Amino acid sequence: MGNSRDDFTSATKELLANRVGRRCSNPACRKLTCGANTNPEKITNIGVAAHICAAAQGGPRYDASMTPEERKSFENGIWLCQSCSKLIDTDITRYPKELLQSWKQLAEQTAILEVETTSSTPALSNFIWSALIVQPFKMTFIKKVEWRILIKRLKIR
């Protein structure tokens, strides 16, 4: 019996990883997925080229209307760390196709901002501020300023 999965090519996997700076595309994670290994001739990679719509029938977010070429295309892929890849496939109601597509778009936009700036700090700051609202408040009993972080759902244009 042949392979019934429409897997990405190596070139597609590389393109997915490189277009987001080899960082997880989940805006709540953004973990670097590749780095040095103790063996100087190797790298450590924890990144995964995940399918937005499943590569095979019965998989998460499978779309029967897609052709095999569409299922294994760059457009149907997203670069994630291993944890986030497992997460999106475990709860498909919480992580629908449209959300994953918005993550991919935001991750690519963030990566290009990092490339265009002299330091990655402004791009990362813009990314963080678009995801978080930070409000200072004073704790009267200890007389110190504390920080409270509220998570706000991102609105992707």
Feature names for model-found ranges:
Residues 24-29, 81:
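Short cysteine-rich clusters marking metal-coordination/redox-active sites
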Residues 17-25, 73-77:
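Short metal-coordination and nucleic-acid-contact micro-motifs, chiefly zinc-binding Cys/His arrays
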Residues 2-5, 31-77, 88-105:
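Histidine-centered nuclease catalytic patch
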Residues 110-157:
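Charge-rich interaction segments
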Residues 1-21, 33-34:
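A boundary/linker detector
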